[in-house]
Amino acid sequence: MAHFAQLDENNVVLQVIVIHNNEVGNLDFPESESLGVDFCKAHYGDDTIWKQTSYNNNFRKIYAGIGCIYDPVADIFAAPKIESP
């Protein structure tokens, strides 16, 4: 199974979905990403933003979760920053 994180315009993760490996040509990351993004856009809208994430291999540093932030320069996901009271 392949996991894809939907991002908002500020690169914050909105949701993570799972799609079958057949939808990404049974390829491994990074070759699988463009096929998965195309699949996600076909189902959620062409104006959506998607990045592949993985809890098995942990490419992009960590597995993306809701509220995580994608850093496009470093090409990683980071945990959300929690401000102290």
Region annotations inferred by a language model:
Residues 1-85:
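Interaction-interface detector
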